[in-house]
C-alpha cells in the first residue's frame, strides 16, 4: 500500500477561509506511449504557462484545478514571481481555444527542497475565478491518510514530450499507468534520486508509458481523485525507472 499524506495538507492550509462565491538537470520533470485525449475527459487539467520576453506566454508545466481560484502544480514549476505565469484552461490545445488566467499568488511548500525534489508541490491562486463548465472542473483530492493500492490504474496527462527530447505536442495526451511498488521504486531509482514518503511512483517495469518533459506539475489520478503531481524520473518511459510523483 502507498499512503497519500503530504500535499493535501498544504492544500487544506491554503484554502482555509477561501470561498467558492526545476528538478536536478539529470532528472526531468516529465506522455509517452499514451494517446490524444479531449479536455472534456480531463477537465481539471491546465497548462501552466510562463512569459518569454516578446513571445508572450508558452507552455511550461501542467497543473490541476482544485477550486475556481486555485490550481495545484509542482514547486519546481513555480520558482519565479507570480507575474511570470498564467494558467490556460478549457482546451485540448495548449495554444488556442482556451481561457488564460493571471496568477495572483504562488505558495510553494515551505519544505520544498530543490536538490532532492522533496515536497514538490505549489499552489497558484488566480486573479479571477475560473468559469466552470464541462471543459473546466475541479478534481477531488484524495484525503490525508488515504491509501492507494499498488497496481491500481492511474491516469497521467499533459502536453509534454511524446518521447525523449522529442517534439512537444500541442494536443493533450493521456496514458494509463499502474501505481508502482514504493520500495522497489526507491531501490531502482537509488542512484538517481531519493524516493521519499512524500512521493508515489507509477509506471511499468518494462517501460513504454510515462509522463515526460513538459508534463511536470500535472495530475496523476486514480478513480477520479488526484493522488500525485508529476515530479521527476529518469528519462521517459524507460524500463526499470517508473515515474515519480509528489504527494
Curated annotation (Swiss-Prot):
Principal place of residence: secreted
Which SMART domains does the record associate with it? Tryp_SPc
The positions making up the signal sequence are 1-21
Q: Does the keyword Secreted apply?
A: yes
**Active-site residues annotated for this sequence:** 76 (charge relay system), 120 (charge relay system), 216 (charge relay system)
One GO molecular-function annotation for this sequence?
serine-type endopeptidase activity
Q: Which GO terms describe its cellular component?
A: extracellular region
Q: Which PANTHER family match?
A: ACROSIN-RELATED (PTHR24252), HYALIN (PTHR24252:SF7)
Protein name (record): Trypsin
